[in-house]
Amino acid sequence: MRQTLRLVGPDAAPQWRLMAGGTAVLLAEVVFRVLEPWPLKVTIDSLVAALGRHTGRAPDTVSSLVGLGLALLVIVAGRAVCNYLATVAFALVGSRTAASLRSRAFHHVQGLSQQFHARNRSADTVQRLIADVNRMQEVAVTAGLPMAANTLTLLVMVVVMVFLDPLLAMIVLVAVVAFMLASSGNSRRISAASLRSRKSEGNLANTAQEALGAIKVVQAYGLEPLLHERFTGANTVSLSEGVRSRRIAARLERSTDVIVGVATAVVMVGGGIRVLNGAMSPGDLVLFTTYLRTTMKPLRDMAKYTGRIARATASGERVADLMAVKPDIVSPADAIVLDRVHGMIHFDHVHAAYEGRPVLHGVNLTVVPGEHVALVGPSGSGKSTLVSLVVRALDPTSGTVSLDGHSLDELDLRFLRSQASVLHQEAVLLTGTIRENIRLGRPDASDEEVEAAARAAHAHEFITQMPGGYDTTVGERGGTLSGGQRQRIAIARALLRDSPIVILDEATTGLDPASTSAVLEAIDELVAGRTTLTVTHDPQAAMRADRVVWIQDGRIRLEGSPQDLMESSAEFRRWANSHLADSFALVGSGS
């Protein structure tokens, strides 16, 4: 619970005025609850006294009854108004706090390294951002507020009962202590079971996301029974843990019923004896039993709310665990923002590791402004790791990567990444229109600039042939478009961004020859005059570069212009000809 309270503290603090107002009316509601039985007590004592004097109906007694009835109406109305205001105030606090926490958590997750996202399933992270925060908000309003009101009511009622009759009040205190003892142990067990349940729900979400995200493969290979079995297994685990927590909560509620029943019976018998002995009036007994009933209701409610709050606490711990992850890569305190970026990139004795495994070993490489360098070599040799260093998706374990003479870890991270356009093998588009996806490169771009970028990327023709043109809505991750179309839209986005550095990571891999040719033409437009690093297994893409760097086992093995390497390196020539025997037969024979 303390961890959850620390988590929401920064988000709840700006709502202090609402919380103060809500607390004030909550206290007023408790006062009205304390006052509510008094008209009934006075009425009973007045009637007993009147009946003891005579059997007639005294006018003053009738007027007193009317006044007491009106007083009760005022008290009930006041309590209702205060309850309404407190509910609204704390509902606003809960909603605003949850929205702030969700936004803060999403911003935090976006700033975590790619290694974090590779290690953690995205569906579980989404579950923490949405479902767990929602549960915290719901329980805070529907259980936290009533429990706070009940706790205040319980404390005030116990104090009042001690003043009314200390002996009978001891019975109530014993009942409260018995409840606290029963609650403390059960709360821990409910929290533990709820935490396991939330983890199981996260696994359930992961299983569903993986199956639906790869539905083409699932259906093509007939994997539906296998994945259904996995989903059912995860669903069963989630169900059993949820039932376990609710069973413990139900046990606590029934134990509380027994405690309340015993306390009520003892007070009823003991109070009746004290009335017969003249130690208290009938009105006092009614007042005391009313307070007892009012006091026991919070105990029953606390038993009911304890389980819900324990489950919310488990959700809070999951969100807190997520927020406790420290970003691996951050801007320095005195970050530098360059007035102008020329695009000189220098790797000086760079070593790098991924997931603890060494990948690069002492790489030295300089890319001059406007130069196009292709990085080739076997898979897993460190090419993608090398270009990841340029935008600080990863930091070297030793050595320095610099831009225009400044070490990257001296530069403002947001500024650094704004200076590079990155195209990956899978061009991911966001749900929305084609125009909106291109405009992500520069949100303030006009429609004319968006169209000009699409023309330069050789995307305008196929876009205008679509029913909605630039306003055609693409599906999730651009699934309604072909790979080549998605890549050309991504290139248009990069052209609109107009950054001095371009990074192409397997941008043509997996495309058919026609799409590859169209994408390569668009890439030529993109890289012109820009510092470019291209990771590729495609000789067509490599031969368009100014320089080719062969990386193997994390080290640079070959380096030179494509033409020089074709002439001087049998290894490079074999690689090129084996990939494009027909296209490069003429080039190879000329070496």
Could you say what each language-model-derived stretch is?
Residues 13-14, 114-118, 131-140, 144, ...:
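An intracellular "coupling" helix at the cytosolic face of ABC transporter transmembrane type-1 domains
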Residues 19-81, 162-167, 278-282:
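Transmembrane helix-loop-helix hairpins at lipid-water interfaces of multipass membrane proteins
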Residues 223, 247, 294-322:
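Cytosolic ends of transmembrane helices, especially the final helix of ABC transmembrane type-1 domains
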Residues 338-591:
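ABC-type nucleotide-binding domain
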